[in-house]
């Protein structure tokens, strides 16, 4: 099969260049890219006026299968990814059973082969994500796990986390840390501050995140292993990561779109789709996160896509589960809130959604080099539409961005040379 993407502006994160090129794909691989490539017999995709970038990678999603298929399945979650412009997703292990052994990792891999995009499983750090004993890391790596995390739960035992970093380091893998001190966050439902006091809701202090970020940076520094800080939300965390990088600590970090767009004031209407963990923080925290994105302290933009059923979220704020969906709004939020606002250049934004997550996970993606898998996202910077959850491919509708006009949207998603989404419609 041959496909020619013609007339687009190629954003190349490896070369660090943006230039008009045609991209020629043969049998699922990138054959070549250059000016005015003419190839007889190829299907032509006109990308004039659009950005052609390596397939976007979301390294933090919750696909909910096995065990929570009412919220999402690998089938629906990968379709949501395709509609959102993502060609690869890495799914967290907080399923039922927990993905803490090779058998569950193999099941997710097998189901992922039938999905619309590439699926990379992340294995649990501890058995059952209970934080008591290490899971079988070697078996999970052999089965296809690309990283280890107890996301949704912190590893409270510092000695256990130290051993996890040591073992992961020996395997050449990264540990993704959900930084939350449960002794500080216990019972909290939103950011601790003026708004939580006004609403009468128990708060989660910034220190609940920051003390664990500091701990895991120290453990990574001592062991020489790699740690990736998930969903950074506070100014203090950004500062700690920036200082650690300056010392040469092998730490990387990600931020979710809701943490660079929304503050705790979004909770004023008691909309349970604003209930996330870590919580929406103060305006100062949002500004610090944006600064961390701009100066390279934060390496990756990842959604923390966390679908829930309408019934689960349609309860009092205190009782609702944490989480919001993000796969189908991420690109629009990045382009509207960061690129159009001048926080990031288009190239910087693409690097944080392609090359950097690929490098953190150690997967052969995020490039448009000849011979690479033909995973490509085409973004139309002029395309705009309001967020309409009724059009989501995800089972989850729990978004606080309902009705928000976003400009700069994925126009086509190509996985292995096959167009899986075009004109906002999944094929």
From Swiss-Prot:
The name this protein goes by in its record: Dihydroorotase
Q: Matching Gene3D superfamilies, A to Z?
A: Metal-dependent hydrolases, Urease, subunit C, domain 1
Q: Which reaction does it catalyse?
A: (S)-dihydroorotate + H2O = N-carbamoyl-L-aspartate + H(+)
What GO annotations for molecular function exist for this entry?
Answer: allantoinase activity; dihydroorotase activity; zinc ion binding
Key words of the record: Hydrolase, Metal-binding, Pyrimidine biosynthesis, Zinc
- List its EC numbers: 3.5.2.3
Lineage of this protein's species? Bacteria, Bacillati, Bacillota, Clostridia, Eubacteriales
Pathway terms, separated by semicolons: Pyrimidine metabolism; UMP biosynthesis via de novo pathway; (S)-dihydroorotate from bicarbonate: step 3/3
Can you supply one Gene Ontology CC term for this chain's record? cytoplasm
Q: What is the species listed in this Swiss-Prot or TrEMBL entry?
A: Pelotomaculum thermopropionicum (strain DSM 13744 / JCM 10971 / SI)
Question: Gene symbol?
Answer: pyrC
């Amino acid at each position: 099969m041959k496909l020619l993407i013609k007339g687009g502006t190629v954003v190349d994160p490896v070369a660090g260049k943006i230039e008009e090129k045609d991209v020629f794909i043969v049998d699922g691989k990138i054959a070549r890219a250059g000016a005015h490539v003419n190839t007889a017999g190829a299907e032509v995709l006109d990308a004039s006026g659009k950005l052609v970038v390596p397939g976007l990678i979301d390294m933090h999603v919750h696909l909910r299968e096995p065990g929570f298929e009412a919220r999402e399945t690998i089938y629906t979650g990968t379709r949501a990814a395709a509609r959102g412009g993502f060609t690869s997703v890495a799914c967290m292990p907080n399923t039922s059973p927990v993905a803490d052994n090779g058998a569950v990792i193999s099941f997710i891999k097998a189901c992922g082969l039938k999905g619309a995009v590439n699926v990379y499983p992340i294995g649990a750090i501890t058995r059952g994500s209970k934080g008591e004993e290490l899971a079988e890391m070697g078996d999970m790596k052999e089965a296809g796990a690309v990283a280890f995390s107890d996301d949704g739960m912190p590893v409270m035992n510092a000695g256990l986390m130290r051993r996890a970093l040591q073992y992961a380091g020996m395997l050449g893998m990264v540990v993704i840390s959900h930084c939350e001190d449960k002794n500080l966050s216990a019972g909290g439902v939103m950011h601790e501050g003026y708004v939580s006091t006004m609403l009468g809701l128990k708060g989660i202090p910034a220190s609940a995140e920051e003390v664990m970020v500091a701990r895991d940076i120290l453990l990574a520094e001592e062991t020489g292993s790699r740690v990736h800080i998930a969903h950074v939300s506070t100014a203090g965390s950004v500062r700690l990561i920036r200082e650690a990088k300056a010392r040469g600590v092998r730490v990387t970090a990600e931020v979710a779109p809701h943490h660079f767009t929304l503050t705790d004031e979004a909770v004023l209407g008691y909309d349970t789709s604003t209930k996330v963990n870590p919580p929406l923080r103060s305006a100062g925290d949002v500004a610090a996160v944006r600064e961390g994105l701009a100066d390279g302290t934060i390496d990756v933009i990842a959604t923390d896509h966390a679908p829930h059923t309408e019934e689960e979220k349609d309860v009092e704020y205190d009782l609702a589960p944490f989480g919001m969906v993000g796969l189908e709004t991420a690109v629009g939020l990045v382009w509207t809130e960061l690129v159009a606002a001048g926080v990031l250049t288009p190239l910087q934004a693409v690097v944080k959604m392609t090359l950097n997550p690929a490098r953190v996970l150690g997967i052969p993606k995020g490039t448009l080099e000849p011979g690479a898998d033909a995973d490509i996202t085409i973004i139309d910077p002029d395309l705009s539409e309001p967020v309409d959850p009724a059009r989501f491919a995800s089972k989850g509708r729990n978004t606080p961005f309902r009705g928000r006009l976003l400009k700069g949207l994925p126009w086509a998603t190509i996985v292995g040379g096959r167009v899986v989404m075009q004109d906002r419609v999944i094929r």
